[in-house]
């Protein structure tokens, strides 16, 4: 066993704490270790690595491996961030004839969405899961049809609906049936994509909240596994998100590169890092502008969007496109950075640095901004820890975790890296993290352009070996995007798991909404910088008057800005 492989002391700790439980182990890369354990010990093993060894649950997913070993499998991927930093994936095999395994959620709350999704997509039952509602599948989906099973269905066909009624039950954990309900949706508060929010209120005060997403689930994983070649999935991953598409394509390509042991040239690695920071600029500036809008500071909104346009020009100069770059390929980058383009980019970065500083000085000195954001939408550090939140959201709650620093990928090992965190846990803290990251992104772009290594852009001539697997990851503006790929034997992926950053943050939104007012809801939701398919209406349920009212989003937005003439009255 090579000593350069990280995670050996975690493996030793597992064997000491649970003798005979680890059935197999293997390293995919020097810092990625997968351990297969006895299924009955799964909750204890994940809890041990999570709370006692400093792990964070990054993603969990199922896999139909009946053609490979006769079983289903469930994978729990943990980012180990205390002491030696590496990745440990806990794998269990699930009997194909009795598709059940013990739920981890009662011990590690971060597992709740992943286990619900595994149940929806594979029919694997997490016994003891506290929330047994569907997560991804609609109410009218047939009970015994599981989309990601290899023998289940043709992804191009949608089965006939089984019911016309909505059967999903929204849960009010802290209130009772006396609470009023405010439904928001099924479209989102900033009109991106659809989701349904339901606020349980007493007058103006939010007692609890619940929400349902996945109204436009696109079936990308099934599409990739059945219809696309390896590099075609690269362009599909570029379109997972309208803002952080390059982060997704970077995470996907690195997952395959890690599985195949492909060493990408340093020049391509650095170009990837530079473009990821350009993407961070226009995403954070968009969010800062929207925060101004939600607090009634529309001149700030317009000015931040004006400066954001400079970052879009920067992207166009470097890539030829303002948004979806299409530059990543497995093994490297399709297009080089030209000398004149780099000179223009440096000039734009200097201009942006001055303009952002002027805007931030105005923003942070605006009394209404402080009144509307300080102490609002608090996310306690303990809740963030329990649910493995990511990105500016977790960093604003006192946890200085950032994949760029914890697990340096692409060119970040060559760049000066500073992780910004805040202790306030509220909306203003999340804004401050993003502000600091804008400055850091500009510095990293300058440094990367000044120190761009020479050499080729691509590695070619490699072959794909079936059934190799590994993780790929990227720190997108909203947090880390995690991809896991297993190669197949027909020049297609056997399994692709794509987890966007917001997926890791949604489960804690209800805790952030509790104790605030209805007029704060758009600002709190916006502080996640959510990426989900969006809502135009909200349902408000008054717990005292025992009635619900549908509030159009424009009314909710107006109320958030003006703070008068409540739409609930």
Curated annotation (Swiss-Prot):
PROSITE patterns: COMPLEX1_49K. Signal peptide: none annotated. Coiled coil: none annotated. FHL comprises of a formate dehydrogenase, unidentified electron carriers and a hydrogenase (isoenzyme 3). In this non-energy conserving pathway molecular hydrogen and carbodioxide from formate are released. This is Formate hydrogenlyase subunit 5. Belongs to the complex I 49 kDa subunit family. GO terms for biological process: anaerobic electron transport chain; anaerobic respiration; formate oxidation; glucose catabolic process. Residues 538-569 form a propeptide.
């Amino acid at each position: 066993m090579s000593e350069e492989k990280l995670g050996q002391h975690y493996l030793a700790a597992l064997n000491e704490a649970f003798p005979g439980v680890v059935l197999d182990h293997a390293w995919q890369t020097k810092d990625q270790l997968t351990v297969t354990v006895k299924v009955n010990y799964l909750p204890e093993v994940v809890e041990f690595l999570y709370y006692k060894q400093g792990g964070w649950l990054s993603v969990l997913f199922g896999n139909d491996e009946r053609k490979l070993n006769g079983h289903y499998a469930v994978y729990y991927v943990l980012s180990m961030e205390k002491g030696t930093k590496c990745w440990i994936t806990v794998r269990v095999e699930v009997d194909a004839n009795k598709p059940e395994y013990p739920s981890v959620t009662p011990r590690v709350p971060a597992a709740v969405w992943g286990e619900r999704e595994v149940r929806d997509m594979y029919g694997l039952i997490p016994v003891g899961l506290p929330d047994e509602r569907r997560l991804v599948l609609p109410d009218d989906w047939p009970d015994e049809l599981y989309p990601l099973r290899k023998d289940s269905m043709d992804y191009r066909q949608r089965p006939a609906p089984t019911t016309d009624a909505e059967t999903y039950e929204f849960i009010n954990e802290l209130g009772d049936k006396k609470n009023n309900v405010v439904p928001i949706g099924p479209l989102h508060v900033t009109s991106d994509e659809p989701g349904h929010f339901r606020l349980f209120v007493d007058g103006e005060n939010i007692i609890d909240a619940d929400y349902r997403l996945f109204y436009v689930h696109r079936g990308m994983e099934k599409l990739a596994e059945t219809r696309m070649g390896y590099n075609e999935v690269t362009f599909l991953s570029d379109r997972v998100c309208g803002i952080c598409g390059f982060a997704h394509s970077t995470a996907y390509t690195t997952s395959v590169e890690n599985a195949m042991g492909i060493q990408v040239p340093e020049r391509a690695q650095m170009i990837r890092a530079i473009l990821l920071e350009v993407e961070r600029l226009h995403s954070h500036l968009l969010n800062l502008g929207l925060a101004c809008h939600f607090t009634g500071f529309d001149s700030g909104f317009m000015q931040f969007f004006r400066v954001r346009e400079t970052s879009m020009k920067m992207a166009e100069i470097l890539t030829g496109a303002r948004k979806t770059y299409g530059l990543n390929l497995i093994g490297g980058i399709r297009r080089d950075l030209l000398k004149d383009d780099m000179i223009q980019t440096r000039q734009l970065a200097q201009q942006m640095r001055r303009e952002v500083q002027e805007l931030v000085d105005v923003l942070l000195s605006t009394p209404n901004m402080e009144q509307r954001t300080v102490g609002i939408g608090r996310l306690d550090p303990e809740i963030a820890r329990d649910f493995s939140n990511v990105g500016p959201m977790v960093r604003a709650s006192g946890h200085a975790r950032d994949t760029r620093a914890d697990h340096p990928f692409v060119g970040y090992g060559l760049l000066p890296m500073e992780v910004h965190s805040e202790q306030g846990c509220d909306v203003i803290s999340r804004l401050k993290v993003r502000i600091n990251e804008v400055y850091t992104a500009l510095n990293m772009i300058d440094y990367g352009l000044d120190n761009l290594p020479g050499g080729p852009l691509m590695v070619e001539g490699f072959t794909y070996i079936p059934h190799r697997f590994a993780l790929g990851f990227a720190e997108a503006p909203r947090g880390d995007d995690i991809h896991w790929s297993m190669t197949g034997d027909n020049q297609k992926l056997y399994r692709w798991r794509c987890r966007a950053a917001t997926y890791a943050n949604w489960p804690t939104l209800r805790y952030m909404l509790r104790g605030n007012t209805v007029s704060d809801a758009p600002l709190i939701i916006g502080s996640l910088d959510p990426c989900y398919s969006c809502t135009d209406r909200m349902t408000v349920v008054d717990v005292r008057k025992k009635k619900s009212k549908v509030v159009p989003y424009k009314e909710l937005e107006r109320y958030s800005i003006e703070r008068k003439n409540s739409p609930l009255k």
